[in-house]
């Protein structure tokens, strides 16, 4: 992680990650724009972030939300595979869900998501707003799985009480990375 884009909050970091994924697909001329998110997830209260949040109670008051978002069961690779299509640009997940209970991704699930993304040209977004910054024993939860995401979001603990968030485009080449966040 050699470059970080700072934001005002975790929700804004996730909003930036969604925009970066769509911009990446646009730049690569893939025609992809859809997202797969997980049930019981929480990604923020901005319009894009609430659109990929896996709780009806957060989304319903703002419907219609961003189109092209489908929800898979957390820790169920078959559920994710069933949703992948030629329009999927990214899969967003929290390695450790906090809003839907303390749900930890399995090793098999994280490795499977990375494989699905690699085989289908899909970006993997890890939302570590709640679980990052040493809260799982590693600096970031993904490190414990040995599964590196393409985009990483973080907040809360990085500010030590000051509202700040950030996103990093990890596996995206330099020229494309600059286009996505400039």
Regions found by a protein language model. Give the residues of each.
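PLP-dependent aspartate aminotransferase-fold enzymes
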Residues: 1-90
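Active-site nucleophile and cofactor-binding loops and adjacent substrate-binding regions
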Residues: 5-12, 130, 155-159
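Short acidic, glycine/serine/threonine-rich loops at helix termini
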Residues: 16-19, 45-51, 102-103, 134-139, ...
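Generic enzyme active-site microenvironment
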Residues: 17, 92, 125-126, 148, ...
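Catalytic PLP-binding core of fold-type I/II PLP enzymes
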Residues: 85, 103-137
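Active-site PLP attachment segment
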Residues: 138, 144-173
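Single conserved hydrophobic/aromatic residue that forms the stacking wall/gate
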Residues: 170-182
